Structures are given as structure tokens and as C-alpha cells.
Design a protein with these regions (language model features):
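Positively charged n-region of N-terminal signal peptides that target proteins for export
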Residues: 1-4
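Bacterial N-terminal signal peptides
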Residues: 7-17
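C-terminal active-site subregion of NodB/CE4 polysaccharide deacetylases
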Residues: 21-101, 107-108, 161-261
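Proline-centered loop/turn at the N-terminus of a beta-strand
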Residues: 97, 123-125, 153, 221
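Acidic (Asp/Glu)-rich catalytic clusters
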Residues: 114-122, 139-157, 216
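Short beta-strand and adjacent tight-turn residues that come in two discontinuous sequence segments
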Residues: 127, 157, 223-225
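Active-site glycine- and acidic-residue-rich loops that bind
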Residues: 132-138
């Protein structure tokens, strides 16, 4: 009986020690989430824009007002390495941290968001869809390199925005979704920036648990979704973001940043 009690105590102690380790999933889930904001197009609405599209298209004046609010309110932008270290080890962050992210390589992110962020010393994360590089209304490789050189982070957003939960492997690399959508775009961005690509965002923000072990094999430190609940087993691969909706007033945006995380 005594041996059983000792063995039980040892197991309980081991479980407590394991759960307290800074890098495990339980510890990561226990840390307070940091606000992460997602942008797509930054331009004024057009007559043909649908109601749904307007959620993803923030008018220029609204974008500028929202960034000014963040600066006036004392927010400090952080980059993914800082967020990763905080989640893994509890490393310190600046007061009122926030991350600004931009999806899909839209040219207005370079022409409008970049100079506006510079006014306040803000940095951002740009999730690049490599099929779009150099196309009309999208950034060029040179512009992506410039963003990287200026201290922003370049990250992957697949080749052409296909949903990750639909990917399949194939003996032919040209037909293997993981090669086409993950491996090749990552290498392309590393060639452009001269830096390792450690971060990824799901197209449409969509993911399903069965893909997470496979995605983990590709070495991304953090993967970003939208506002769905994080996966308790893979919190680093399901980091939450909120859209800064084109419909939102500055007050609504401020409240969402404060209360969504």
C-alpha cells in the first residue's frame, strides 16, 4: 500500500512539474492573449463592393484614425518573435502591446499602411501570397524586400490562398499541395528577404485540427488564424486575430482591441 502511495505521489509531482513548464500548451493557454489585428485592403469603398467585402476593406480615413487612436492610447506594436518568446517563456513585452498584420500582398498596404505606420514608429507583419507578387494592385518583390529591410516581418500566406484543411500529399511534387502552397512559397520569400520565414497565416483564417500536426512539421513558430477559439493542444498554431472591420468606428475598434482578447 505504501509503495502505491509513493508511486502515486511521484506521478502527481511529475504531472505538476510538467504542467508548470513555461513552453507547454497549458502554460501558453494560461497567458493573457495579446491583441492581434488583421487588415486586408485599405481603400475607399466602391459601388460594387458587397456588404461582406466591406468587412475586409477599411476606408483610408478610418485606417488613419484607428492607427492614431492606437498611438494616442499608448499602444506599442510588437513583432512575432516577441509574441513567441512571451508565449513560450513569459518574456516581458512593452506596455499595451499590439500586433498589426496585413494579408494578401495588396499594394495599398505598402502605399498607405506603411507610411502611416511610420508616423508612429509602428511595425507590422505582412503575410504574402506569392502568386500575387508583381501583379497589378499587388506588391512587387522589391517592395516586399523593402518592408523587410525597414524592420517589418514578412511571413507566408501560401501560393494562391487555398485552404489548408483541403491540402493533400502527392507523389508528384507539382501536385503536392503542401509543397506548392507551403514549401515553395516559404523558400521564395526567404530568397526575397534573405531571412528565415518563421510565421504563417491561414487563408480565410480557416483551419481544422487534423492539419495541425502536419503543419507543425514545416517549422513555423506561430501560425495565425482569425477569431476562432484556439486549439488547446496547438495554441502556437492557432493564434487569434480580429479584423479591423470597414464598418467600425474608432470607438468600436478601440473596444474590440480591449475586450476581444
Amino acid at each position: 500500500m505504501l509503495k502505491k502511495l509513493i508511486a502515486l505521489n511521484v506521478l502527481c509531482f511529475f504531472a505538476l512539474v510538467t504542467s508548470a513548464q513555461p513552453g507547454n500548451s497549458a502554460a501558453i493557454m494560461a497567458r493573457k492573449q495579446v491583441p492581434v489585428v488583421c487588415y486586408h485592403q485599405i481603400r475607399d469603398w466602391r459601388p460594387k463592393d458587397s456588404k461582406t467585402a466591406k468587412d475586409y476593406i477599411i476606408p483610408i480615413a478610418a485606417f488613419k484614425q484607428h492607427l492614431k487612436m492606437l498611438a494616442d492610447s499608448g499602444y506599442h506594436t510588437i513583432l512575432p518573435d516577441q509574441l513567441y518568446n512571451y508565449l513560450k517563456t513569459g518574456a516581458a513585452l512593452p506596455s499595451k502591446p499590439i500586433m498589426l498584420t496585413f494579408d494578401d500582398t495588396d499594394l495599398d498596404q505598402f502605399e498607405i499602411a506603411r507610411p502611416e505606420m511610420k508616423k508612429y514608429g509602428f511595425k507590422g507583419v505582412f503575410f504574402i501570397m506569392t502568386v500575387s507578387l508583381g501583379r497589378p494592385h499587388y506588391m512587387t518583390k522589391e517592395q516586399v524586400k523593402q518592408l523587410s529591410d525597414e524592420g517589418n516581418v514578412i511571413a507566408s500566406h501560401t501560393w494562391d490562398h487555398h485552404r489548408v484543411d483541403k491540402y493533400k500529399h502527392d507523389a508528384n511534387p507539382k501536385k503536392d499541395d503542401w509543397v506548392v502552397q507551403i514549401e515553395k512559397p516559404t523558400k521564395k520569400l526567404e530568397e526575397i528577404t534573405g531571412k528565415k520565414i518563421n510565421y504563417f497565416a491561414y487563408p480565410f483564417g480557416v483551419w481544422k485540427k487534423p492539419v495541425l500536426p502536419e503543419l507543425k512539421k514545416y517549422g513555423f513558430k506561430l501560425v495565425f488564424q482569425l477569431a476562432d477559439k484556439r486549439d488547446a493542444d496547438y495554441p502556437l498554431l492557432t493564434v487569434r486575430r480580429i479584423l479591423d472591420s470597414g464598418y467600425w468606428t474608432t470607438k468600436t475598434f478601440s473596444n474590440s482591441v480591449k475586450h476581444s482578447f
